[in-house]
């Protein structure tokens, strides 16, 4: 039995052996594997896995291997079955005569429009190795930024959960036991103590309902944002917020500049590059404004002026883009602008977290102090009455 990724490949293998194939049938095992591919491919590939595959492919192509040979080698090096099957299927399409970009287009959930457009440009220009290396750098950079953001958010999230947990335990477990002692005093309790008792009873009786309400509210909010107009309006509001708005604007403008930079360096036309770069933005309002800027560039407006009219990009980035247009080095200036914006984004995140963390600690300490003082106040008043 001869094995291959497609019937055409099996026929070619048989002809190379001096045999004339009359009929090629797919085995049952192969059919089962094909039936399971949909499930495998739905898992896709993580950002780090995609960067590794791209880097390996760039290295092998640079070493002089054909696309088919490079894909075979990459598939053999994949440890996970779904990745190995994915790369093998891309290779089978290449063997059938499709271009690499068209072959990758069969899996848009893994290889997005940016990835495929750059590969197509690299194939046309004959610089596929450079394009793949740029793609690997870009993917690794995005993974690096995502990892740094997650690492920065871990401590505040844990601190918030601990604060909420401690306060909830105090209100639902500690306060009720202490309050039971106050019931036998027969005296007027201070206002702070009465407020604490009311809050504790509210948490005991309606705490679970409150959590359920939060869950339902989150679900309704997600459903509300499924409407394109409402989501775009909300994203516009987000960009206007004091701290979150600056962070969101910095993240999206840096992503746009870096994406357009590598597309421009890969010989992708500017208008097509702007369209693709706009699609990678996470903010719908910013994506709409980029679409409007693309139309203005199509009508003859300079890139700098078109982006300035979006009211999203910072002045420094616009100056660098204008300099790149005048000097003919737009891709390098866009890359520098993206680097500057990434550094500013990291600074803004660090400042925001630097302010949030002590505020959270102080707030938690204030709440705990309020609970303790509300409990101690009637006890101290009782001691004073006894001493008198």
Curated annotation (Swiss-Prot):
Membrane-crossing segments per the record: 154-174, 206-226, 351-371
Coiled-coil region: none
Alphabetized UniProt keyword annotations: Calcium, Cell inner membrane, Cell membrane, Membrane, Metal-binding, Protein transport, Transmembrane, Transmembrane helix, Transport
Main location: membrane
One Pfam family, short name: T2SSF
Record localization: Cell inner membrane
GO MF: metal ion binding
Covalent S-S links between cysteines: none
Domain of life of the organism encoding this protein: Bacteria
Topological relation to the membrane, as annotated: Multi-pass membrane protein
Region (Disordered) residue spans: 1-28
Residues where Ca(2+) binds: 79, 133, 137
Periplasmic compartment residues: 175-205, 372-388
Gene Ontology BP, a term: protein secretion by the type II secretion system
Residues in compartment: Cytoplasmic: 1-153, 227-350
Example of a GO cellular component annotation carried by this entry: plasma membrane
Protein family: Belongs to the GSP F family.
Known partners and oligomeric status: Type II secretion system is composed of four main components: the outer membrane complex, the inner membrane complex, the cytoplasmic secretion ATPase and the periplasm-spanning pseudopilus. Homodimer. Interacts with ExeE and ExeL components.
Record's function text: Component of the type II secretion system inner membrane complex required for the energy-dependent secretion of extracellular factors such as proteases and toxins from the periplasm.
Protein name (Swiss-Prot/TrEMBL): Type II secretion system protein F
Species of origin: Aeromonas hydrophila
Phylogenetic lineage: Bacteria, Pseudomonadati, Pseudomonadota, Gammaproteobacteria, Aeromonadales
GN (gene name): exeF
